[in-house]
């Protein structure tokens, strides 16, 4: 299994229940397709660098996971057709140095905080 990271941004107009439902939906897509989720990092609502689909803010999530390569096409398809996702990025960690960084990121985040809370980023004017 390969090491991956997916970052996705949800619309800021969603309620907390809808955000949690979309996060669970993405996690379900991963687990149903034999992925092992290492860490989920909710990064909170942040101002975007530029408008995306008329939105200036978005709710960010990062998921570190291990998965077979055939899962990525399905994950991309699901994220593209999900209206609430305004942008996403999937990163594959390939060489030993990158995998070591992935391990450090996924386990370091997990061990440093028992429950990860969203970051309150100050709004930039």
Swiss-Prot record:
One GO CC annotation: cytosolic small ribosomal subunit
CDD domains to which the protein is assigned, alphabetical: bS6
Alphabetic keyword roster: Ribonucleoprotein, Ribosomal protein, RNA-binding, rRNA-binding
Biological-process GO terms, alphabetical: translation
Superkingdom of origin: Bacteria
Pfam families from the UniProt entry: Ribosomal_S6 (PF01250)
MF GO annotations: small ribosomal subunit rRNA binding; structural constituent of ribosome
Function as written in the Swiss-Prot or TrEMBL entry: Binds together with bS18 to 16S ribosomal RNA.
NCBIfam families for this protein: S6
Name of protein: Small ribosomal subunit protein bS6
Organism (species): Campylobacter jejuni (strain RM1221)
Gene designation per UniProt: rpsF
């Amino acid at each position: 299994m390969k090491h991956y990271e997916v970052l996705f941004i949800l619309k800021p107009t969603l309620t907390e229940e809808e955000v949690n439902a979309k996060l669970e939906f993405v996690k379900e897509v991963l687990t149903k397709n034999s992925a092992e989720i290492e860490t989920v990092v909710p990064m909170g609502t942040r101002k975007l660098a530029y408008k995306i689909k008329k939105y200036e803010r978005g709710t960010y999530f990062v998921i570190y996971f291990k998965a077979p390569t055939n899962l990525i096409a399905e994950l991309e398809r699901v994220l593209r057709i999900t209206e609430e996702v305004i942008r996403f990025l999937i990163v594959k960690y390939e060489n030993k140095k990158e995998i070591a960084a992935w391990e450090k990121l996924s386990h370091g985040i997990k061990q440093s905080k028992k429950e990860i809370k969203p970051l309150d980023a100050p709004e930039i004017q």
